[in-house]
């Protein structure tokens, strides 16, 4: 109940706003996210990726940029059509392997019948998703949103222009190709169309021809194996068929692939595996006996390396290698006298329609991503792209792997190929440059579908897009609309290129690499993408998020449960980069309480006080400030620097660490040290709010408007001094060491802390020798630490020889002295104390007394080294 009341309080404070971004004199920043597919509501996995783009857009706004972050909805492809078709079959009484009816009911719809029409999906889920993201308080300009497919005439025309242009540039071709194919949908099945088997590709399989009285049995064979025995499952289904004037028998799964890869096949009969049991066959001139066993096993030839006839084994090996390199023709399979090659999926693939996929030789229109000249340009684009090292490595690997991409489909929603309207353009190919339309969509039409027209849709043609994107002259028929189109062109040239593209890491080898290819092909280099950020999958409570397991949460469920600001804070700390992240509900709950305390802290500080200190005025009095005040000033400045760097790197866990947790800890320590300056505390609260604005914008807006008044922008570090920060770290470390040593004492009431003012004479001499040699190295531009790693340093032996002389002089054990010297050589900063240890400990001995229960006496002693006080318990 406490959490719910505090959540209601936070929600009441949050200030929403509409985001509008237009062409202006300011610097622009254009952020885009890979639009989601519209076959359901948005879930936390979507929101995690979206949050990365949203956080960064607010950050750039703080920096003074004119930020554009638009959002749209992808409807192209077969999943929606397949689900609608499957639902119709389910409602008519057919048995299904996965209930679409239950899925839709679980999404909150009582009447499922309208969903038998694919268009109903397209007109339902985009609106729901938009409402969810508005509740999330995203920094999105909703005027620019749209849906894809030919339902939207503007998008349809835009995609037709894209493919006409690719065709003009010679990037398209037509032919046959082995593709993963869904027999239910009767078309190729891409990764996005699969329920199981993402990234699975066709693989060539070599079969051995085993001849017998009834025909030829096709069996799998291992390379180098001389046939001696065949094994079949007695209950397995086999198909007898005629092909090229021969009668063959093959397992049903093998036959379904073979039948889709060659013409002229005629089915004759079906038999079980026991039909072949006990029969004698001939393979490569050797007699082969067939065993039918009571297991569901593939039909396979077994054997060994034939030592009596090594030439036969070598012949079989060479034949298999040869046929593996031979491609099928458009009508015939690759074969020799004893072998036949076909293709099958390398692993099981199930389409979203529930069909078990095969490999088929299909007519296809292709995008020639294999073009070496095109790849060179994309490589240059990747080299200049700002991204993490692992993202770049995956993109470069994808660039090597990618070849021709079949983009024509016969089933689903989308845009038809302009010159071959029998086919649709696939969903991964119509989603590569749509970000360009964001820059001017609101000048053409107002709604998602293009029904509320500003520019007449009956005037759409390639001439429109050529004018906007290629700076071509306006045609006579478009002259009446030149003002609209001129605004479109101006807006495109102002906002392009994309400054940041955000998406899941699973899209790097398909959508995101296609995105780069198409931008490189269709736009000038000045319009190529500048930065890309990808993230891993999101787990929920340390387990994979899955509807079937019940471990699943939609955006709306999270916002209902934890509110906007707590959900956003939890998303920020889930994880960064391409590693899988983890949304933990207990963390989200905890953020409700933490944010409530944060707001109350500011309310208590500011209520009844007139506080609005100028940083310049505070800095004027910095030299006269006490230890605690200087400590807090330094900590604020340092955390601002760290949090700003984290914002720039998109490592949001660190933003929360330095912008929230470290600030709260600093405030607590400030009070322990006796600090009472409300103006510095006000500065801390304001800096926290500024740094957290990209994460919790609507709550930050309330705090800004209510307490901070001033023009709100990104704070900047204002101090390089860290003496008091070092002093507090020293104080904490001294307490930690003291407590550890106290545990070993039976009874003690008093502790003397012995502080060193300078190092012992032998240490000072060693340090002087090292400083002198290090200075010589610096003059010669030699990195001693790097040389030590390689073991080839010419200066380290010189240092050791000089140090040995000092150790002999003072009678110091050699091992002890050299260890000290090498540590000083590598970490000289650890031996420099920038504050007065004695004064720090004496002024704050109460801190140690309160935490240990001991009376503390601080004194200077030559026995102690600077930075490492000694303890004497009494």
Curated annotation (Swiss-Prot):
On the tree of life, the source organism's domain of life is Eukaryota
Positions of ATP binding: 547
EC number(s) stated in the UniProt entry for this protein: 6.1.1.4
Name the Gene3D superfamilies on file. HUPs, Valyl/Leucyl/Isoleucyl-tRNA synthetase, editing domain
What reaction gets catalysed by this protein?
tRNA(Leu) + L-leucine + ATP = L-leucyl-tRNA(Leu) + AMP + diphosphate
What GO biological process terms are annotated to this protein in UniProt? Answer: leucyl-tRNA aminoacylation
Supply the alphabetized keyword list: Aminoacyl-tRNA synthetase, ATP-binding, Cytoplasm, Ligase, Nucleotide-binding, Protein biosynthesis
Compartments where found: Cytoplasm
Q: Which InterPro entries match?
A: aa-tRNA-synth_I_CS (IPR001412), aa-tRNA-synth_Ia (IPR002300), Leu-tRNA-synth_Ia_arc/euk (IPR004493), Rossmann-like_a/b/a_fold (IPR014729), tRNAsynth_Ia_anticodon-bd (IPR009080), Val/Leu/Ile-tRNA-synth_edit (IPR009008)
- Motif 'HIGH' region, chain ranges: 36-46
One family from Pfam that matches here is: tRNA-synt_1
Q: Where is this motif: 'KMSKS' region?
A: 544-548
Tell me if Translocase is a UniProt keyword of this record: no
Q: What is its main location?
A: cytoplasm
Similarity comment: family membership: Belongs to the class-I aminoacyl-tRNA synthetase family.
Q: What is this protein called?
A: Probable leucine--tRNA ligase, cytoplasmic
